[in-house]
Amino acid sequence: MRRVLAMLVAGLALAPPASAAERSLLVNGDSLAEGTKPYIPRELPSWRVMQSAAVSRHAYQGDEVMRRYGSRLPRVVHVSLGTNDDPGDLDGFRDAIADVMRVAGRSRCVVWANIVRPPYRGVSYRGYNRVLADEASRRANLRVLNWVRMVRRHPEWLADDGAHVSARGYQARAEALARSVRRCE
């Protein structure tokens, strides 16, 4: 009996704390998420990081990506979507955010980066960023990563297309994301 008790106590001592077991992140995004792929795991070494990034992924595809994880969907989700969508369709973007948040549920933290890119068909992405900020103000578990402010402070990061950035820019984005993700704990 003592031997069993000793083994049980030893096993408990070796088990990670509950909070460490819950440190998991899904990155759900487009080409900007592709750019941060090598940096995020380095910034969150004690986290289990899963990444689903695809060039040209649209915001309306975000919820389906998350559904594929089912019960394995991490407690924290980073969304990098909207850059490939029509900024004139504010209702569509709001619906995409609502769909992602519905899949996330109230117990998960979602960190969504706002959008930097030139206007599309003469329409700015400021409207999308306002919609995202508005949705975040109404949802305790939705946080905005202020990518717009970061790029405004470091325009030298921007590539010629006005949407993608240099390696230093992706590194800085991953660093900022890691800070936001840690606040979800």
Predicted regions and their residues:
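Active-site flanking residues adjacent to catalytic metal/cofactor-binding acidic residues
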Residues: 28-30, 113, 145
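A short helix->loop->beta-strand "cap" motif at the edges of active sites that frequently abuts
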Residues: 105-109
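Sec/Tat signal peptide C-region and signal peptidase I cleavage site
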Residues: 16-21
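Alpha/beta-hydrolase-fold catalytic nucleophile elbow
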Residues: 80, 113-114
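Bacterial N-terminal signal peptides that target proteins for export
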Residues: 1-5
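Catalytic His-Asp segment of secreted/periplasmic serine-dependent ester chemistry enzymes
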Residues: 118-185
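Conserved SGNH/GDSL esterase-like catalytic core that processes O-acyl groups on lipids
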Residues: 22-99, 119-127
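Bacterial N-terminal signal peptides
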Residues: 6-15
